[in-house]
């Protein structure tokens, strides 16, 4: 009667917990697992974990949990690409000198003097000036026309000297253009220097006259 009550209590209660069934691994199986662990390149910690499971007689895990050193780290955020400014176009290669010469890059345009006046006539004019000290052409230009009522005002000597110096400069430039500047350069420069001294004398004399005129007033 007592045993029957005891059976009823067991059946009505939670009952006994069943202990999981232990597995006995043969030495051959253990050796095979060791070889497989080496081939799988498991760490020492993972190998010891599996060996402990085998010693306890538990079922082998389907996946071996990685160690802390092998845990997958959170993927780093991919940095956004940096856009650099566009590179300037490369400088073109320099052409060799012989190619430049062939294309005429080094050729210079030859100077061609352009005579604006009759050089022979100008030379004759200057020779007359050197010989007589007078400019016949200038006198011809200054001659008043026959029908002119009032005579043209006579040019001031200072202005005449300025004009004569300018004419000699132009003549020397024309001779330089013809390659004959060396022949006339000394004479022309001497004439210009003489006329400059005469202009200085005129200027000095005018200054004295102006000073005297201001003193008398």
UniProtKB/Swiss-Prot annotation:
Q: Which cysteines are joined by disulfide bonds?
A: none
Q: Under which name does UniProt file this protein? A: UPF0193 protein EVG1
One Pfam family name is: UPF0193
Q: Which family does it belong to?
A: Belongs to the UPF0193 (EVG1) family.
């Amino acid at each position: 009667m007592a045993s029957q009550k005891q059976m009823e209590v067991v059946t009505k209660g939670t009952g006994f917990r069943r202990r999981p069934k232990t597995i006995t691994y043969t030495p051959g199986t253990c050796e095979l697992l060791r070889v497989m662990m080496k081939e799988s390149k498991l760490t020492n910690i993972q190998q010891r974990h599996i060996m402990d499971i085998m010693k306890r007689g538990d079922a082998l895990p389907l996946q071996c949990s990685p160690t802390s050193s092998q845990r997958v780290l959170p993927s780093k955020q991919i940095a956004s690409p940096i856009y650099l400014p566009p590179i300037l176009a490369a400088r073109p290669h320099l052409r060799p000198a012989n190619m430049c010469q062939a294309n005429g890059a080094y050729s210079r345009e030859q100077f061609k003097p352009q005579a604006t006046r009759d050089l022979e006539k100008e030379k004759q004019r200057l020779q007359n000036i050197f010989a007589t000290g007078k400019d016949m052409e200038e006198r011809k230009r200054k001659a008043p026309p026959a029908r002119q009522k009032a005579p043209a005002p006579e040019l001031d000597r200072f202005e005449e000297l300025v004009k004569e110096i300018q004419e000699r400069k132009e003549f020397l430039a024309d001779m330089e253009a013809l390659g004959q500047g060396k022949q006339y350069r000394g004479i022309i420069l001497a004439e210009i220097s003489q006329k400059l001294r005469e202009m200085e004398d005129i200027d000095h004399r005018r200054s004295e006259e102006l000073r005297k005129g201001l003193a008398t007033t």
